[in-house]
Amino acid sequence: MPLKGRLGLETARVPHADRHGLMWLERGRLAVEDGNLVFTTAGFDDLEAGAYDIPYQQVSNILLGPGGVVSHDALRILARRDTGLLAVGSKGVRLYATSMPFGPDSADRARTHAELWADEETRVDVAREMYQIRLGGELPSHQRDLDSLRGIEGRRVKKVYQNLADQHGVEWNGRRYDRNNPDANDTVNHAINHAVTAVYAAARIAVAVTGTVPELGFIHESSGHAFALDIADLFRSSTTLPIAFRATKKVERQPGRDIEPTARKMAGATLRDEDVIPDMIDQIKDLLDRES
């Protein structure tokens, strides 16, 4: 198939090639033709069906979504150029594989991350900064006990839940989730679970492409993706919970709709339209790229 166009970072035809050099591709085959990296697609979002050159020299990571396949030669070219490849759900609502997230050609940020985490004082400093973001304001300088900060945030989140319930006209009886009997949860709690899963996947993508250390969380511990949980929580009030309550209201207005695909699709649209993953990357850089 002859090339129909050039898939560049500055073209409006590719809405997901963002300021961090992330290129989103779906419904097509990434392969090498005549020495060039080419994506042949059936079309998705604003991109018409056709074959497109990929300017991999300008791309930091390719995020390959549903319907995407990649050839061995394409993997070889990407590896040679230190261009990452991640297999993701539509618009980043899932992360399936990070086999080639080479990240920045430097260990500086990972080293800084580890150093900040290893020192008890700086670990608390970063955790406090995260709580400031989550709480939307400055904290008293003497407030360094994380348990008390968790209590403050817990009270604030309860208000966020109620405000969103009032705003969208959704009945709210509290946050509940029975892992042993998930079907017993009400619609809005199901929606929150699905929104949390999507935003957490977005945070894992942001952690992968920044070359930071997933296991080293400043607030969360034990999980192999503790840092992604930290980052996802920074967007709970602004992104995750609004998705859940909007999805719940949509299902209530249209009986017969399933909350899981509704919440997932709404999450994908939000991640794309509000540049959530680029914002997460910026947030990671702001937290870790600090003056020593």
Segments predicted by a language model, with ranges:
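Short solvent-exposed loop/turn micro-motifs enriched in small/polar/acidic residues
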Residues: 22-23, 47
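Short, exposed beta-strand/loop patches in secreted or surface proteins that constitute
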Residues: 29-31, 54
